[in-house]
Amino acid sequence: MAAFIAKQMVGDQLKSVKAMGGDEGEKEGNENAEEEAAAIEEARREAEERRKEKHRKMEEEREEMRQTIRDKYGLKKKVKEEPEAEADLDEGRVGRKKKTKEELAAEANEEEDDDEFAKFPTDLSDLTTKVSELPQKMAASVGEVTEKCSLQ
C-alpha cells in the first residue's frame, strides 16, 4: 500500500515537471496513446476471436459426444420449439399478441375473397329482378333480330 502511495506522489510530481517543459511531451504522449489504444483494441479483438473459435470447437466436441450417446442408447434429438410458440405462452405480456405467419396468410385470403364478393350485387332482391327480366329481354332481342333479317 505504501508503494502505491509513493508512486502516486512521485508520478504527480513527474507530470508537473513535464508540463513545465511545454506541449512537446503531450504531442508525443498523444501519438503514443493513440498507438497504444489501437494496439489494445486489436489485441482485444484478436482475443475475442480466439475465445469464439475455442467456444465453437468445444461446442462441436460436445455435440459429437451427445450424438454418440444418442446413438448408443437409441435416443432422439430434442427439437427446439419456435420462438413464436414460446411467445404465445407468455401470460404476463403487456402488449398485444403478435400474429403468426398462418394468421397473416389467412387474413390476406379473406381480403381476396372480399374483393371477389364485391363484384356481386349486395341486395338479393335486385339480383332476382334482373334474372326474372332476362327471358323477356332475350325474347325481345330475338324478335328484333328476326325482323331485321329475313330468311329466303
Curated annotation (Swiss-Prot):
Domain of life: Eukaryota
GO cellular component, one term: cytosol
InterPro entries linked: Synaphin (IPR008849)
Region annotation Interaction with the SNARE complex: where it falls in the sequence: 59-75
UniProt keyword Cytoplasm present: yes
Complex formation: Binds to the SNARE core complex containing SNAP25, synaptobrevin and syntaxin-1.
PANTHER family: COMPLEXIN (PTHR16705:SF4)
Record protein name field: Complexin
Protein's gene: cpx
